[in-house]
A protein has these predicted regions:
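A short helix->beta-strand "capping" segment at the edge of beta-propeller domains
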Residues: 1-4, 34, 286-301, 380-382, ...
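Beta-strand-rich domains and repeat architectures in extracellular enzymes and scaffolds
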Residues: 1-27, 299-322, 585-607, 611-612
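Blade-terminus and WD-like Trp-Asp/Gly-His loop motifs, strongest in beta-propeller folds
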Residues: 10-13, 47-55, 91-99, 137-145, ...
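A flexible loop/linker signature enriched in serine peptidases of the S9 family
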Residues: 19-25, 40-44, 59-69, 82-89, ...
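Predominantly a core beta-strand signature of beta-propeller blades
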Residues: 33-36, 76-79, 123-127, 167, ...
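Conserved blade-ending motifs and adjacent loop-strand segments that build the rim/top face
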Residues: 238-252, 341, 474-485, 588-592, ...
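Extended repeat-based solenoid scaffolds, especially LRR ectodomains
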Residues: 305-311, 547-587, 595
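Intrinsically disordered, Ser/Thr/Pro/Gly-rich linkers and terminal tails that flank
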Residues: 582, 593-596, 605, 613-757
């Protein structure tokens, strides 16, 4: 049994090269202790011995994108040979001692259309004459076999029989034309000729390859990819391996002309010839499980949500829930179980509690715990509610009082969960994709959201649920335009949405054409049909004293002299709601992330960073312009850019502060005016107080399990198309205990999900 997850072997005489732990290794074909020959610790693919066995070429992601590298075994020196920057590149083998064969789509506009090339040891690249392909094998006699390109071998597309399955084309020595191997209509008893075929090589005058063409549905769906061969004319098909489900798919067979190696389920196998039995190569890497590693504070810092007063924030950090005070103090781990993943932690109003979604119970649930780290009611553990009733939680939003939580499920349901009782109530359902933009009225009576009209990419309408109503949600806008991001103003008088209702075309700069670029504005509708719009002229004029009174009240609040805020009561007249919508007095643009703050609203104005390709800023020095945070005050009746650089932000529960994130910096600023970095009202949050060590395999096990739940939850048929999904997960889960990198995990996930084909 190998001590790791071993892949992509190649052989030369009695030496095998393979990949493990994101590096290249060498081991005798008889097995034993392996030697690491690279130390880059990046994903690597397809190591290939040169004909003399003195060099190894391979694909490495050391430069972020896959490129061809070569290693001299005598000196240990490695060199990068290509600088293509393509999304795909596969090292295939050696044309001769000085030229390496690879495939890449770098000269096409189709990432899936790879062509065959050679690169010399001095970096000269030439395209081969064989057309598109992802593999190439040339026999000593000059017979040529190529494989048509696609996204991967059959281990990722198990039992795939579509038009892009890899097919082998043969050209006999001395011939000019290629012929396709195993064509439709030919007599191949019990073989599905539409299956993909991969990993070609020549041995004893025969062409070997791997394929799952023995899996003929529905008779034997569990048949694995095996090693097959044909003669130089594409006839005399033979099967050479008989792997079961426990052994796995035969993958990436390679031969030096006398011996064959391949891998399956992270194990290496060797065959001394076509008629020999395949034996497992026992390899000892000499490395243990990946050690616990510290996590950077901004690594997978997914979300930041403020508490009520803006004194601290709940963070979703690498699958855990943390509470971090904004000005000094330690970070508190509220839920950091390595076997579970936490999502969307948020404060429950001014209760001192937080809530988040967690898969700790296998099915999603909500967890509730105190922000001081004492758990729920000093138990030291979070309280779990609604387990198994929520589906896969996509979004959640607590009510202002913290007594209810709105949840959007993967199946389109909009749910209300009582924090006290855990009771779940369905209040809406989006039949065309997920609902988004959950928002409560200040009194917690109304819940609004956006849902698509005809499909996830179509226009969206605003829906509302009234706690005092009959229980059914109702539609506020028709969805004729794309309405999104609804929010109630803090005074409970208005509902504001972002809506793409501006149709002011611009001429194209290259052709005689018109397009609609900036279509979005914030729009407002009074909840009450008798409430006037806050915009436009009024007979009495707009009072200056209102602004002065608002400033005086803000100063009194800051001094602690204010009385308790008056209770806000909302009353929504749904009839004629859309007819009451009026635009804010701002120019249409590209806006997102609308939110209500005290005495106003804020949103992000997206900067003009040029086109999709980046050519508009080619040669421009400095950073691209950043998105800005814009504030509109109802009392001042003016718009102001209060933060010049923002990626995301959160509003404190009282609406008085904003927690702003830009790149790796987080700061707290007032919600209604701009402050400099030196202003006492500007607080830079020290993220270095976030400290945590994670054990990689614990995370990888959680990722594997969550992926299994996601597939079961989202699969297009309830019966999983007859696949015993739990049995599949049980078969592949032990492989996670052998992996040493996240790239290994991705490989296992590809194989696991491929079982659903």
């Amino acid at each position: 049994m190998a001590s790791g997850y071993l892949r992509y072997p190649d052989i030369h005489d009695d030496l095998v090269v393979f990949t493990a732990d994101d590096d290249l290794w060498l081991v005798p074909v008889t097995g034993g202790r392996a030697s690491r020959v690279t130390t880059d610790h990046v994903p690597v693919r397809n190591p290939r011995f040169s004909p003399s066995g003195t060099r190894i070429a391979w694909t490495s992601y050391l430069a972020q994108r896959p490129e061809v590298y070569v290693l001299d075994l005598a000196s240990g020196q490695q060199h990068r040979l290509t600088w293509l920057g393509a999304r795909k590149l596969l090292t295939i083998g050696w044309l001769d001692e000085d030229h390496i064969v690879f495939c890449s789509p770098h000269q096409t506009n189709d990432v899936g259309l790879m062509w065959l090339y050679t690169v010399s040891l001095d970096g000269q690249i030439e395209r081969l004459e064989y057309g598109p392909g992802m593999d190439l094998a040339i026999s000593p006699e000059g017979d040529i076999a190529t494989v048509t390109p696609n996204s991967g071998d059959c281990s990722k597309w198990k039992r795939y029989r579509g038009g892009t399955a890899g097919q082998i084309w043969l050209r006999a020595a001395g011939q000019d034309e290629f012929t396709r191997l195993l064509r439709d209509g030919e007599d191949h008893d019990g073989i599905d000729v539409e299956a993909g075929r991969y990993g070609v090589g020549w041995i004893d005058g025969r062409l070997i390859f791997s394929s799952d063409m023995g899996a003929v549905l529905p008779d034997n769906p569990t048949e694995q990819a095996q090693l097959w061969s044909v003669n130089a004319h594409g006839a005399d098909l033979r099967q050479h391996t008989h792997h079961s489900e426990e052994h796995g798919y035969v993958r990436d067979p390679r031969t030096d002309g006398t011996t064959i190696v391949y891998h399956a389920h992270g194990q290496l196998y060797v065959m001394d010839g076509l008629d020999a039995h395949s034996d497992q190569i026992d390899v000892e890497l000499g490395i243990g499980a990946p050690a616990p590693v510290p996590v950077d504070p901004t690594d997978r810092l997914q979300s930041i949500a403020s508490d009520f007063g803006g004194d601290g924030s709940l963070l979703e950090w690498r699958g855990a829930a943390y509470y971090l005070t904004h000005r000094s103090g330690p970070a508190r781990a509220l839920s950091a179980d390595a076997t579970a993943r936490v999502r969307s932690p948020k404060a429950l109003g001014n209760t001192g509690l937080g809530v988040w979604a967690s898969d700790v119970t296998d099915d999603d649930c909500l967890e509730v715990a105190a922000l001081d780290g004492s758990g729920y009611r000093d138990t030291g553990e979070p309280r779990r509610i609604a387990a198994g009733q929520l589906g896969m939680v996509l979004w959640l939003e607590p009510s202002p009082a913290g007594d209810k939580v709105a949840v959007v499920s993967h199946d389109g349901r909009v749910l209300i969960v009582s924090v006290e009782s855990g009771q779940v109530r369905q209040v809406g359902r989006s039949a065309q994709g997920e609902a988004t933009g959950l928002a409560w009225s200040p009194d917690g009576r109304y819940l609004v959201w956006r849902q698509a009209r005809d499909g996830e990419d179509s226009c969206g309408a605003i829906f509302c649920w009234d706690e005092h109503g009959l229980g059914e949600s109702f539609q506020l806008t028709k969805g004729t335009f794309d309405d999104s991001n609804p929010v109630f103003t803090a005074d409970g008088k208005y509902l504001v949405v972002l809506s793409a209702r501006t149709f002011d075309p611009h001429y194209d700069g290259q052709t005689f054409d018109l397009s609609f670029g900036h279509t979005i504005r914030p729009w407002l509708a009074p909840l009450s049909a008798s409430e006037p719009s806050p915009f436009g002229p009024v007979p009495e004029g707009w009072r200056i004293s209102e602004v002065q009174d608002a400033k005086a009240k803000a100063l009194a609040n800051a001094a602690g002299d204010s009385d308790h805020a008056p209770t806000v009561t909302c009353e929504l007249d749904s009839d004629g709601f859309e007819e009451r919508l009026v635009p804010f007095p701002v120019a249409s643009g590209r806006y997102r992330s609308l939110a209500a703050v005290k005495d106003g609203v804020v949103w992000i104005e997206e900067a003009d960073r040029g086109g999709e390709l980046g050519a508009a800023r080619a040669g421009v020095t400095g950073e691209a312009p950043a998105d800005a945070l814009v504030h509109y005050g109802f009392a001042s009746r003016r718009i102001e850019r209060i933060v010049e650089a923002v990626d995301t932000f959160a509003v404190s529960g009282d609406g008085e502060r904003l927690i702003v994130r830009h790149k790796d910096e987080v700061s707290v600023v007032p919600s209604d005016h701009k402050v400099d970095a030196e202003d006492p009202a500007h607080v830079a949050v020290d993220l270095t107080r976030l400290r945590r060590r994670i054990t990689p395999r614990d995370e990888w096990r959680q990722m594997f399990d969550e992926n299994g739940r996601l597939m079961a939850t989202h699969y297009w048929r309830d019966d999983m198309n007859g696949v015993d999904w739990e049995a599949v997960l049980r078969r592949y889960r032990p492989l996670v205990d052998r992996i040493h990198s996240v790239d290994d995990l991705y490989d296992i996930l590809w194989e696991t999900v491929g079982e659903l084909n």
